[in-house]
Amino acid sequence: MSFLGTPYSNGATRAMLLGSGELGKEVAIELQRLGVEVIAVDRYANAPAMQVAHRSHVISMLDGEALSQLVQQEKPHFIIPEIEAIATETLQKLEQEGFNVVPTALATRLTMDREGIRRLAAETLKLPTSPYFFAETEAEYQQAVEQIGFPCVIKPVMSSSGKGQSVVRKADQVAVAWQYAQEGGRAGRGRVIVEGFVPFDYEITLLTVSAVDGIHFCAPIGHRQEDGDYRESWQPQVMSDALLEKSQHVAREVVKALGGYGLFGVELFIKGDEVYFSEVSPRPHDTGMVTLISQDMSEFALHVRAILGLPIGKITQYGPAASAVVLREGNSTDIRYGNLPAALAQIPGAQLRLFGKPEIAGRRRLGVALVRAENVELAIEQAKQVAAAVDVKF
């Protein structure tokens, strides 16, 4: 854009967030820093990003008619999807009408489910991936498992935060994994992907920025997953120059194919001298929350700069850093956090982000601890120490 306006004025620059969780909250804050009028949307009230937006709306974003009516009402200059469960056909129609969908409506459609992006990467771009089959019915699923063999990974084609994902290692786990995948899909029961298990040495998130001044890469981020969801992430992940170059090549090809401006979280498996494409999100990635302390520009700041057509320039990484999630289990609409002075005082320079989620029902990520240290291993342990010390009361 040639100019950025002032909120609530006739010339305001308006951005609509579709999805208002903790990642959307940080995007909203970065938009606010540049004077953008922020409209936060989600399926429930008082979502984290709504708490820092100029105004908010509660709708089902899978309801294409409701979504279209809201966009026509607000007339945002930028529509910024922050989750997968959105009526992507509606976004494509809105883009055709002249609305700016970030990064593109095509990218949102292809990445809203694992089938679109896997077919793009493996079949169109010919990038290395694990072997895979898609299944619509339980019979197709069982046949796919037989063809892939054990161990294999089962995922709903549309889910987030590890929901519905499992590793099947023997025959008596097959039926259970199917049911778990059906329960964990974002849109309810539906297709699954059956993947061959890659016995990787490690996995990384390569945050890749497509901006007016070209494609930029953050230092690779390592992470540990448990039950399909990340628990700790760290930057930089140590890897050879050759592997980093291969990783950047894969990420560049995927991002170029998806098009548009913004930050992309490209997930890759590293095995020996090989790099395998796993998934990509056309938006900030949960493992990238470590960049809130590890870089001069966080993934959220980079996303916003790219969206607004601002140059990225040089990304400065400060050295070994880690994040550890504050994960708790319970049921409450009155969540309180204690022992914060002690939690932070034990590690000089430690930081904490509490997401402000309005309720917990079961297991939920409520915050993240952030630490810089002399080495990655120490940063991970210290971040876990801070996260564990937070006293969450329901």
Swiss-Prot record:
InterPro entries: ATP-grasp, ATP-grasp_carboxylate-amine, ATP_grasp_subdomain_1, PreATP-grasp_dom_sf, PurT, PurT/PurK_preATP-grasp, PurT_C, Rudment_hybrid_motif. One of its GO terms (cellular component) is cytosol. Its EC number is 6.3.1.21. Residues 119-308 form the ATP-grasp domain. N(1)-(5-phospho-beta-D-ribosyl)glycinamide binds at residues 22-23, 82, 286, 357, 364-365. It catalyses: N(1)-(5-phospho-beta-D-ribosyl)glycinamide + formate + ATP = N(2)-formyl-N(1)-(5-phospho-beta-D-ribosyl)glycinamide + ADP + phosphate + H(+). Pathway: Purine metabolism; IMP biosynthesis via de novo pathway; N(2)-formyl-N(1)-(5-phospho-D-ribosyl)glycinamide from N(1)-(5-phospho-D-ribosyl)glycinamide (formate route): step 1/1. Belongs to the PurK/PurT family. Homodimer. HAMAP family: PurT. Involved in the de novo purine biosynthesis. Catalyzes the transfer of formate to 5-phospho-ribosyl-glycinamide (GAR), producing 5-phospho-ribosyl-N-formylglycinamide (FGAR). Formate is provided by PurU via hydrolysis of 10-formyl-tetrahydrofolate. This is Formate-dependent phosphoribosylglycinamide formyltransferase. The gene is purT.
